[in-house]
């Protein structure tokens, strides 16, 4: 089934300029709708770890983008205080008490998750925003005013602190989603964008900005890398001097590996999770 879906969506992507809400073949509509439904359920995901390496399913990202091409904007109720006007409904628009109980997560007003995002058991959504195609795994806390961008992959037992920005893939168009692996702590107001991967058990301090062009300096080895934080790293904001010493530019600094003291400071509070 997935192979057939992929073929339909890949073909539709090549002909996307010809598609509109009023002009799209039935099989394309059905394929895109099914892909979004499977993303919403967590049965499919835009990226997954296979044999230790992350594989990005580009066809699912295409399905997300095509869904915007196929839908008209429509009014959407907003709890009586306002209205929205958009192409993508809320994930929870038609949820019943039984649906929430089966999902096993908490949604604190006025948190928003778009249809096509997956929220796993024991996740806590504080007043935050989770975009279409995102995958938020078990036990994760998305704290107040944090944003989880389109198709971003958030692992198990992650803490996204207040105001954290996890970048999406839709605009500007990105090849790969941001990936935050299991047991990571992302400090307040930090930003991780442009397909950066933060490997498991890492701690990103408050106010760290990570994109593909951000230099990542390892204090222990003196090495500079880009686009990936190694597993178990503690990262803070810093600066590196220019070669001529005339100025310095922002960088992220790996100051040490996570130890018991660090883990105690950023440990998850189980009282906030579960039924």
Curated annotation (Swiss-Prot):
Molecular function terms, GO-annotated: 2,3,4,5-tetrahydropyridine-2,6-dicarboxylate N-succinyltransferase activity; nucleotidyltransferase activity
Q: What is its EC number?
A: 2.3.1.117
Q: Which UniProt keywords apply?
A: Acyltransferase, Amino-acid biosynthesis, Cytoplasm, Diaminopimelate biosynthesis, Lysine biosynthesis, Repeat, Transferase
One Pfam family matching this protein: THDPS_N_2
GO BP terms: namely:
diaminopimelate biosynthetic process; lysine biosynthetic process via diaminopimelate
State the oligomer form and interacting partners: Homotrimer.
Q: What is this protein called?
A: 2,3,4,5-tetrahydropyridine-2,6-dicarboxylate N-succinyltransferase
What is the organism of origin for this protein?
Burkholderia cenocepacia (strain HI2424)
**Gene encoding this chain?**
dapD
